[in-house]
């Protein structure tokens, strides 16, 4: 069963993980170098042992594929995954005249009074991003995040490389190539990035008329992050298979530092007590010639009947 791949990762780290400190000072149980394999012909690997919001996954992936780096598109689709990174740029700017938002990520979790103030300020910010083109251009853009690296990698000569278009062309015209790789990891950007790319590099492989994808993820939050990553790259594989006239093969997920945060241990144990349900099916309401023309409404999952959401704090 598809989901057992993920549940076995949780079990393995609970039983064998190393206690480690981390950037967020939360503490983790961690292992290094873990691989999962998902046969996409068996269904779509959206977890059923807890609800995973597919709407957020597809709008974020399509945002990446459009080469967009401004959160306005996400906000238009009620997706707030990247809000904090843009909000941080705003509250640290000279133009911001509101209440002190220093260390808002930590304070919003530990100070209920501050959290209410933070929510008001962030809502004002996102509304202004949606309504004000000039403000959005200045404070909604996140710079060299995934969309930029995938679609407009900056070279030393000042040109850009569209890695997604290049890899689709290679799959169509040279499917035996071992160079069908997209990288988001740019050593030059790492020191200045708010969060260097976690899903760093992925590679495609064609055999027997099927397209497979392997992701190398340098760092993976097992409870909150990895379920998103699995579904996102499975969807990417499906989209590129459609664009190249291939069936889907496997999604192979290789993780460097795979970790469970210490404040997620109870949630992981609760999830492991649940019985997986049948995997949903991915359906396309409309198929486009170009992978870059899809909108969230074109893609749905059918037969998704998950167990309820399990809430957990985000490590900041």
From Swiss-Prot:
CDD domains recorded: TS_Pyrimidine_HMase (cd00351)
The name this protein goes by in its record: Thymidylate synthase
Main location: cytoplasm
Lineage of the species this protein comes from: Bacteria, Bacillati, Bacillota, Bacilli, Lactobacillales
Gene Ontology cellular component list: cytosol
Pathway this chain belongs to: Pyrimidine metabolism; dTTP biosynthesis
Subunit structure: Homodimer.
Family membership: Belongs to the thymidylate synthase family. Bacterial-type ThyA subfamily.
Keywords: Cytoplasm, Methyltransferase, Nucleotide biosynthesis, Transferase
Protein's job: Catalyzes the reductive methylation of 2'-deoxyuridine-5'-monophosphate (dUMP) to 2'-deoxythymidine-5'-monophosphate (dTMP) while utilizing 5,10-methylenetetrahydrofolate (mTHF) as the methyl donor and reductant in the reaction, yielding dihydrofolate (DHF) as a by-product. This enzymatic reaction provides an intracellular de novo source of dTMP, an essential precursor for DNA biosynthesis.
Pfam families: Thymidylat_synt (PF00303)
Compartments where found: Cytoplasm
Gene Ontology MF terms in the entry: thymidylate synthase activity
List of catalytic residues: 198 (nucleophile)
GO biological process: dTMP biosynthetic process; dTTP biosynthetic process; methylation
PANTHER family named among the record's database cross-references: THYMIDYLATE SYNTHASE (PTHR11548:SF9), THYMIDYLATE SYNTHASE 1 (PTHR11548)
Annotated EC: 2.1.1.45
Recorded catalytic activity of this chain's protein: dUMP + (6R)-5,10-methylene-5,6,7,8-tetrahydrofolate = 7,8-dihydrofolate + dTMP
Leading EC class: transferase
Positions annotated to bind dUMP: 23, 178-179, 218-221, 229, 259-261
SUPFAM superfamilies linked: Thymidylate synthase/dCMP hydroxymethylase (SSF55831)
Residues binding (6R)-5,10-methylene-5,6,7,8-tetrahydrofolate, per UniProt: 221, 315
């Amino acid at each position: 069963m598809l989901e057992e791949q993920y549940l076995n990762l949780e079990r393995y780290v609970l039983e064998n993980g190393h206690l480690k400190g981390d950037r967020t000072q939360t503490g983790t149980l961690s292992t290094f170098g873990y691989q999962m394999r998902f046969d996409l012909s068996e269904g779509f690997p959206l977890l059923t042992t807890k609800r995973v919001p597919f709407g957020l996954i597809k709008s974020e992936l399509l945002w990446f594929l459009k080469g967009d780096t401004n959160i306005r598109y996400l906000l238009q689709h009620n997706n707030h995954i990247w809000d904090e990174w843009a909000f941080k740029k705003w509250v640290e700017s000279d133009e911001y005249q509101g209440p002190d938002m220093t260390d808002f990520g930590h304070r919003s979790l530990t100070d209920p009074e501050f959290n209410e103030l933070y929510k008001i300020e962030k809502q004002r910010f996102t509304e202004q991003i949606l309504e004000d083109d000039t403000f959005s251009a200045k404070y909604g853009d996140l710079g060299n995040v995934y969309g930029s690296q995938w679609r407009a990698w900056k070279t030393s000569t000042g040109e850009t490389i569209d890695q997604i278009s290049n890899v689709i062309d290679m799959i169509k015209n040279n499917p035996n190539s071992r160079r069908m790789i997209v990288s988001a990891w740019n050593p030059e950007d790492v020191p200045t990035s708010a969060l260097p790319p976690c899903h760093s590099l992925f590679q495609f492989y064609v055999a027997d008329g099927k397209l497979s994808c392997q992701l190398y993820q340098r760092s993976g939050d097992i409870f909150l992050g990895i379920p998103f990553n699995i579904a996102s790259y499975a969807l990417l594989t499906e989209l590129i298979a459609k664009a190249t006239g291939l069936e889907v093969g496997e999604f192979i997920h290789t993780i460097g530092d795979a970790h469970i945060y210490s404040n997620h241990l109870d949630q992981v144990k609760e999830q492991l007590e649940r019985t997986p349900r049948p995997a949903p099916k991915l359906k396309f309401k409309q198929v486009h010639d170009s992978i870059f023309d899809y909108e969230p409404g074109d893609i749905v999952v059918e037969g998704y009947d998950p167990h309820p959401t399990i809430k957990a704090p985000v490590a900041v």
